[in-house]
Regions:
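An N-terminal-biased, well-structured beta-alpha scaffold segment characteristic
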Residues: 2-112
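Conserved small/polar residues in nucleotide/adenosyl-binding loops
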Residues: 116-118
């Protein structure tokens, strides 16, 4: 599977959804991992740490969404990401659908498969 890790862009969210150790595990199991440039920097992980374990760095969030079969995030997509989610993608993140009708409708329109915990 092609896994994409976009940099979190929601206000005050500094975590990254996959550590270099997690990326290493996925790569060892035959998956391809793409990390958006500087996605891990606010969590203390450099692009080089991801590259050392076999992950590939992409320059933009659009690049990550365009290539990934599965997107892994910490927080739900925000409005500027809605149109990046594709019908054939899995999106794994924390969704808060009950309090965000716009997000709920956008994800329903995307036709993607959503994996979440609330």
């Amino acid at each position: 599977m092609i896994v994409g890790i976009p940099k979190e862009i929601k206000n005050n969210e500094n975590r990254v959804s996959l550590t270099p150790a997690g990326a290493h595990e996925l790569v060892q199991r035959g998956h391809t991992v793409y990390i958006q440039h500087t996605a891990g920097i606010n969590s203390g992980f450099s692009d080089e740490e991801y590259e050392k374990v076999g992950a590939r760095i992409l320059p933009t969030i659009k690049d990550v969404y365009a290539i990934a079969e599965m997107i892994i995030k910490v927080k739900e997509p925000i409005e500027c990401e809605y149109n990046l989610v594709r019908k054939d993608q899995l999106v794994f993140t924390y969704f808060h659908f009950a309090c965000d009708k716009e997000l709920t409708e956008a994800m329903m329109r995307s036709g993607s498969c959503l994996l979440y915990t609330s």
